[in-house]
């Protein structure tokens, strides 16, 4: 993923998740949405891209449940909590509630409606799988640069990984990244 947000745009991690209702809140059941396939993730991202029309957002495919959304916004001052920290927790307490996040919450609510009605979730239900019923937006922060690997060690280098985080670190240090077809970063690869 080689995304360079423009002026006035911010990138956010956009993870597909499975929420479960409780008596007074929605609970983060699975922050990976059952490790859905990259193909299914792309299908759902396309639905979000075509149906969320009242907000200036662009969705970018990553790996499985972990994707990226770029939106027009000033940087957020408050940290958005990663979904893996919320498993088993009610999400209401982690939803940003300041006026600064109004559009972000609106996007998440729209996504829930779109995903609820998507044919992919009907198929998942027939197969006995949990639905992909929400997105979780997080990972806001500032872009950074690292000291150049080449300047530091008088060598060039490449990183072979499926991890988007490690690819980002490598690029920030001026290193090449190598993608391996079929690699997901999960234990099966």
Spans of features found by a protein language model:
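…; additionally, a secondary subgroup of soluble metalloenzymes is captured
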Residues: 1-189
């Amino acid at each position: 993923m080689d995304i360079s947000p423009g002026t006035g745009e911010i990138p956010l991690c956009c993870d597909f998740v499975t929420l479960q209702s409780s008596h007074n809140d929605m609970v983060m059941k699975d922050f990976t949405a059952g490790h859905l396939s990259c193909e299914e993730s792309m299908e759902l991202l396309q639905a979000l891209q075509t149906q969320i029309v009242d907000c200036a957002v662009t969705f970018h495919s990553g790996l499985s449940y972990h994707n990226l959304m770029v939106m027009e916004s000033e940087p957020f001052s408050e940290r958005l909590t990663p979904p893996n920290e919320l498993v088993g927790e009610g999400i209401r307490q982690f939803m940003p509630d300041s006026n600064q996040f109004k559009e972000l919450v609106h996007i998440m609510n729209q996504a829930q409606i779109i995903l609820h009605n998507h044919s992919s979730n009907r198929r998942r239900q027939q197969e006995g799988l949990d639905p992909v019923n929400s997105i979780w937006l997080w990972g806001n922060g500032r872009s950074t640069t690292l000291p150049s690997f080449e300047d530091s060690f008088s060598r060039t280098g490449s990183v072979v990984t499926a991890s988007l985080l490690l690819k980002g670190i490598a690029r920030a240090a001026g290193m090449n990244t190598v993608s391996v077809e079929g690699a997901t970063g999960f234990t099966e690869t």
